[in-house]
């Protein structure tokens, strides 16, 4: 949805992109690698990988990274907070990119905030696929991945000297498309939508974020 908004130029020249993944878990979850402190554990390697990858897909690799990574929960062995700034991305060097997550975000925050010279877009809530899967709903179910209209993001633009606030339809998500692409790549030679070089790039950015935070 964000990519579509940008491709249509609905906000004019984009100047700021903020992606936040709010979580609230003020205790240490037992029996999970995410809380053990082993390599690959912690919030930055877990959720950080997703928000970094999304930003890179939209704006390209940055020239530099500035980050603050911390452990805020009592007795936590892993990082549970990060704020990462990606500086001068290759596709849009002037865009200010901020990526943020924490396990101590009890109040809701927007998932995406975009500001351009001609408007803004603010989106709360998450892709509904994970919740549906947890409830036992299968991806073959009609209207899979479609978001309720009440969860659509809001476009804030100026029309005729007035600020107008309009819901913008969320495009349906489709986790299965990733695996279908791998199948078609193996069986039919179709190009991968996400190759190993991109994965390595995201890992390097996470490592750079850690280096910046030390």
Language-model segments: which ranges?
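Short arginine-rich
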Residues: 205-214
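C-terminal glycine/acidic-rich active-site capping loop/insertion
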Residues: 113-193, 197
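Glycine-rich phosphate/pyrophosphate-binding beta-alpha loops
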Residues: 49, 74, 100-108
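A short, glycine/Asx- and small/polar-enriched loop/turn
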Residues: 76-81
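Active-site beta-strand termini and strand-to-loop segments that position acidic
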Residues: 84-94, 114-117
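Predominantly a Rossmann-like dinucleotide-binding segment in NAD(P)-dependent oxidoreductases
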Residues: 1-75
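Short beta-strand segments
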Residues: 18-19, 66-67, 98-101, 115
């Amino acid at each position: 949805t964000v990519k579509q908004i940008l491709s249509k130029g609905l906000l004019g020249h984009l100047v700021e992109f903020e992606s936040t993944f709010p979580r609230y878990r003020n205790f240490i979850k037992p029996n999970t690698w995410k809380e053990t402190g082993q390599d690959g554990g912690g919030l930055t390697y877990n959720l950080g990988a997703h928000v970094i990858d999304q930003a890179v897909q939209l704006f390209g690799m940055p020239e530099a990274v500035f980050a603050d990574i911390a452990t805020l929960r009592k007795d936590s062995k892993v990082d549970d907070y990060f704020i990462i700034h990606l500086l001068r991305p290759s596709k849009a060097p002037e865009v200010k990119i901020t990526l943020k997550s924490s396990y101590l975000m009890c109040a809701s925050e927007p998932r995406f905030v975009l500001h351009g010279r001609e408007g803004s877009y603010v989106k709360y809530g998450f892709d509904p696929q994970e919740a549906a899967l947890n409830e036992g709903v299968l991806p073959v179910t009609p209207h899979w991945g479609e978001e309720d209209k009440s969860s659509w993001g809001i476009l804030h633009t100026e029309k005729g000297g007035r600020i107008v606030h309009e819901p913008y339809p969320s495009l349906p998500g489709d986790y299965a498309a990733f695996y279908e692409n791998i199948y078609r790549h193996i069986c039919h030679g179709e190009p991968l939508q996400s190759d190993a070089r991109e994965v390595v790039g995201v890992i390097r950015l996470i490592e750079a974020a850690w280096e910046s935070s030390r």
